[in-house]
Swiss-Prot record:
It comes from Laticauda crockeri. Binds to muscle nicotinic acetylcholine receptor (nAChR) and inhibit acetylcholine from binding to the receptor, thereby impairing neuromuscular transmission. It comes from the Eukaryota. GO terms for molecular function: acetylcholine receptor inhibitor activity; ion channel regulator activity; toxin activity. Keywords: Acetylcholine receptor inhibiting toxin, Disulfide bond, Ion channel impairing toxin, Neurotoxin, Postsynaptic neurotoxin, Secreted, Toxin. Belongs to the three-finger toxin family. Short-chain subfamily. Type I alpha-neurotoxin sub-subfamily. Expressed by the venom gland. This is Short neurotoxin C. PROSITE patterns: SNAKE_TOXIN (PS00272). Residues 1-16 have a biased composition (Polar residues). It is found in: Secreted.
Length: 62
């Protein structure tokens, strides 16, 4: 699986996930800096108030 891993509005970058990792995620939240977006491999557990979208195809988490 390959997932995007750039932060917020940085130029697109992606990486290959470890063997057996078939999910990508996109987390989004707001703080004093504005809206923060984090992308990567897997499907992490998030705290309340953080939007999480997990998906299972190549580069699906932009």
């Amino acid at each position: 699986r390959r997932c995007f891993n750039q932060q917020s509005s940085q130029p697109q970058t992606n990486k290959s996930c470890p063997p057996g990792e078939n999910s990508c995620y996109r987390k989004q939240w707001r703080d004093h800096r504005g809206t923060i977006i984090e992308r990567g491999c897997g499907c992490p557990t998030v705290k309340p108030g953080i939007k999480l979208r997990c998906c299972q195809s190549e580069d699906c988490n932009n």
